[in-house]
């Protein structure tokens, strides 16, 4: 039997130190990676619960194991709350990740070798949207669309021409580094012209969609996928949604289980249920409004400091900084900001001349900093510090000065008080 003395601290000091160090890093560094956020203690509690012990292959009421009556409650709560949150008829909360959700949709709607279209990774897409190094580009024939070289915006006319030329069976509308609003109706129109399914990947903007601050694709897309972290501020996991379509719903259920996965992670599903309940609260919309305000503020400050933003601005939680004209690489910028305790990620920009391991850009996002309590005042300070570091990535005295300021601000706004 187990008792309270069975702690990591008393058993594995190396691992305990790593966890403690990571907790300190999160408290002492400002997180600007657009895909990261901080979950509430309630989400942590659910994910660390005894539900981790339970195998539950199948779906609520139709399990292949006994003893699932209580984990069924958790999954049904997650499903019903997600339906309410997104206005969806069908929800599957079992995918372990956004990539698993995307893979399940492709398994449900495509056969190996079928043609589909997705946004090119260097233009802001995701690995699972057709990258040749990913399953999506290996199992299926992917055709990539991108952004206009001059505007940095999706070229819908060029996308339509590609669709008419290649006749894809599926079109993916979604991104990992695109700062503008997608025209779901235009995507639907293009998909209908070639008889394609339309899948919307809202992994980055799900929280904004949930509160009505970013247009919902649910009325337009055949299937919608998302992660449950990022702007949704839940545990790491995936989610599949769709409007009413019995045939597609059956295919999706079969693709997730038994097609892609065996037993679902019931402790994570419980944590999803908690996060969805939090997202249904009025304060979650207030939070998302601040995420947008902070992103606009950051964009404005960096532009005033002479930094180019791809597409010229942002309509969501992220912005892509183009460093080509500054003569520094994304890798150099990432490392320099890291030394100042500001965490970012290097990112390719459209038509980037450098490799994905080096890049010419930075992707910045405001969800985590906003969760911390930052508003326009703090974001203005922070954005100027970012520019101060980027102005001379080799000035260690200046980087040290910024780090000192960052630490003071972090103490003023702890993550877990």
Curated annotation (Swiss-Prot):
SUPFAM superfamilies: PLP-dependent transferases (SSF53383)
Entry EC no(s): 2.1.2.1
Stored PROSITE patterns: SHMT
GO molecular function: glycine hydroxymethyltransferase activity; pyridoxal phosphate binding
Pathway where this protein functions: One-carbon metabolism; tetrahydrofolate interconversion; Amino-acid biosynthesis; glycine biosynthesis; glycine from L-serine: step 1/1
Keyword tags: Amino-acid biosynthesis, Cytoplasm, One-carbon metabolism, Pyridoxal phosphate, Transferase
UniProt keyword Amino-acid biosynthesis present: yes
Pfam family for this entry, one: SHMT
Cofactor: pyridoxal 5'-phosphate
Family the entry assigns: Belongs to the SHMT family.
The protein's assembly and partners: Homodimer.
Function according to Swiss-Prot or TrEMBL: Catalyzes the reversible interconversion of serine and glycine with tetrahydrofolate (THF) serving as the one-carbon carrier. This reaction serves as the major source of one-carbon groups required for the biosynthesis of purines, thymidylate, methionine, and other important biomolecules. Also exhibits THF-independent aldolase activity toward beta-hydroxyamino acids, producing glycine and aldehydes, via a retro-aldol mechanism.
Protein's recorded name: Serine hydroxymethyltransferase
Species the sequence originates in: Legionella pneumophila (strain Lens)
Gene from which this protein is expressed: glyA
């Amino acid at each position: 039997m187990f008792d309270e003395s069975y702690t990591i601290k008393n058993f594995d000091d190396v691992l305990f130190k790593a966890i403690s160090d990571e907790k300190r890093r999160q408290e002492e560094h400002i997180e600007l990676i657009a895909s990261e956020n901080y979950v509430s203690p309630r989400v942590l509690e659910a994910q660390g619960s005894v539900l981790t012990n339970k195998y539950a292959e199948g779906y609520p009421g139709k399990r292949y194991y006994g003893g699932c009556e209580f984990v069924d409650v958790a999954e049904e709560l997650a499903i019903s709350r997600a339906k309410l949150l997104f206005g969806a008829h069908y929800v599957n909360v079992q995918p372990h990740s956004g990539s698993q959700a995307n893979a399940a949709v492709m398994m449900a709607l495509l056969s190996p070798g079928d043609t589909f279209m997705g946004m090119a990774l260097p233009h802001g897409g995701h690995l699972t949207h057709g990258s040749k190094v990913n399953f999506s580009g290996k199992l299926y024939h992917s055709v990539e669309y991108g952004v206009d070289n001059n505007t940095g915006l999706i070229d819908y006319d060029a996308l339509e021409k590609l669709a008419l030329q290649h006749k894809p069976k599926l079109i993916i509308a979604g991104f990992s580094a695109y700062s503008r609003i997608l025209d779901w109706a235009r995507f639907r129109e293009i998909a209908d012209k070639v008889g394609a399914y339309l899948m919307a990947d809202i992994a980055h903007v799900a929280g904004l969609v949930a509160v009505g601050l970013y247009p919902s694709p649910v009325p337009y897309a055949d299937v919608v996928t998302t992660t449950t972290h990022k702007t949704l501020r839940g545990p790491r996991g995936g989610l599949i949604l769709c409007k009413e379509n019995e045939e597609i719903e059956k295919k999706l259920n079969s693709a997730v289980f038994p097609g892609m996965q065996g037993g679902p992670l019931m402790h994570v599903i419980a944590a999803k249920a908690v996060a969805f309940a939090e997202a249904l609260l009025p304060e979650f919309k207030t939070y998302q409004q601040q995420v947008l305000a902070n992103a606009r503020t950051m964009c404005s400050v960096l532009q005033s400091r002479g930094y180019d933003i791809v597409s010229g601005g942002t309509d969501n939680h992220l912005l892509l900084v183009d460093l080509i004209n500054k003569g520094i690489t994304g890798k150099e910028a990432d490392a320099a900001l890291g030394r100042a305790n500001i965490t970012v990620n290097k990112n390719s920009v459209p038509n980037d001349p450098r490799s994905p391991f080096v890049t010419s850009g930075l992707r910045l996002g405001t969800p985590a900093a906003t969760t911390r309590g930052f508003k326009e005042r703090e974001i203005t300070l922070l954005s100027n510090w970012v520019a101060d570091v980027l102005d001379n990535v080799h000035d260690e005295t200046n980087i040290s000065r910024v780090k000192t300021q960052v630490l003071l601000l972090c103490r003023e706004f702890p993550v877990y008080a």
